[in-house]
């Protein structure tokens, strides 16, 4: 039976400068006695550590932890890149044999293979991000993505001029349905008459497919697309920037995911990133490692991170696009969620009932 664990230390801390994509983490501190004998590693899903999204955020958390303790890649922490699903078991096995104290599987697609490895290596501690494995040596880390998606839905509803917005998902799954459901509920809470188009690429690593979907959506009059599709979302950004380059006066936007994807939207003097639903995977990864170092492994427990723990937020980096009235509306709805006045749906069935009740 899975138990609910407590989310501690790292949540709510201030943002740190991150080594985005570099292999080594460096710091002025010498490795502490506590960290000298502790090591952690992660296996990516197909998106990889440079996906500018979910996997990259997890890797940044691992790097941050390493930097805090004077460690470097290959000497205290590491990652194994998965280019195909067939890489999951070999990557997990290699890290086990390299004797890492805590091994993360990044993404729900690793669930089946991580379960097999965890059952085989019962003395090794594991953690899975974005899914649940009910084993005594696996901590399950999940996020309340529907909360953040609801809030960017509110922002999109306040921003759209065509009353048409889109959602691009990676793989049609219960996890990504949480993003879809929250987004639709947020949009409809502001204006039930706004049309929300939903399409899935069935991949987290197909930028070309993402670009095609975005092209069709923008051509249909949609002016804001929220993506929850990992590397596939790079194609959404590329299409938006291509359109903006050819028609600088056209107002169209992308809502990023997982990290603040402001930089991905830059095109000359413009930026097509409206906002991002920031999911602090880095915070969760670093937090769980720090707890494991103290002997608190949380195997068999579910650790949930949401807006209550400052692990889910809405980016306001694009100050020109995220105007004060939009930010005010987002904050008002955030308070309603925190106060329990709004129960954000996380499935299509719950979303249908929520919208019908507006």
PLM features: residue spans?
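Sec-dependent N-terminal signal peptides
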Residues: 1-3
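Bacterial signal peptide processing site
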Residues: 12-15
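A residue-level marker of the well-folded mature domains of exported/periplasmic proteins
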Residues: 19-358
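C-terminal motif of bacterial Sec signal peptides marking the signal peptidase cleavage site
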Residues: 7-10
